[in-house]
Amino acid sequence: MNGYQKLYQQLLEPSGDLIADIKNLKGDILILGVGGKMGPALAKLAKQAINRAGINKRVMGVSRFSETGLQDELHQCGIETYPADLLDDRQLAGLPEAENVLYLAGMKFGTTGNESFTWAMNTYLPGRVAERYKHSRIVAFST
């Protein structure tokens, strides 16, 4: 294991405070946009905190999964995955229920010439997600 890999593993170690918080959190966790820059690490950190807390709670991730191997990597960590295009209303409606939704989906890079898609991802989609998960706690997180 090289220095980068060691540092990455250290960052995935849940703190005592996180373990206590996740133990008190009601319901499962759904991460929309799990395939982005922050998603995989966040999903793994949540799953490790759940395991350390000794509780039974699902961590689920939704993405288009365009990165080869990511879906398998998340499965190996005990994270359920759901390939979906969040802009497709039928696919969004078919996603599992969750009391806790982390919204990480968005468009930041490669937006030149793709302004309409950027608008849809960053403006239209959050409203659709809020409607779909209106009975859930939603945290929107963006870089």
Language-model segments: residues:
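Short beta-strand element of Class I
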Residues: K57-M60
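Conserved Rossmann-fold NAD(P)-dependent oxidoreductase catalytic core, especially the SDR/UDP-sugar
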Residues: D28, N100-Y103, K108, A120-T143
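Short, conserved loop/helix-junction motifs that constitute active-site signature segments
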Residues: R52-G54, L95-P96, V129-K134
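NAD(P)H-binding glycine-rich loop region in Rossmannoid oxidoreductase-like domains
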Residues: P40, T68-G69, E73-M121
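Non-catalytic terminal and boundary segments that flank Rossmann-like NAD(P)-dependent oxidoreductase
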Residues: M1-L30, R52
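N-terminal Rossmann NAD(P)H-binding glycine-rich loop of SDR-like oxidoreductase domains
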Residues: L30-Q48
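Alpha-helical structural signal in soluble globular domains
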Residues: L45-A49, E73, C77, R128, ...
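N-terminal Rossmann-fold cofactor-binding loop
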Residues: V62-S66
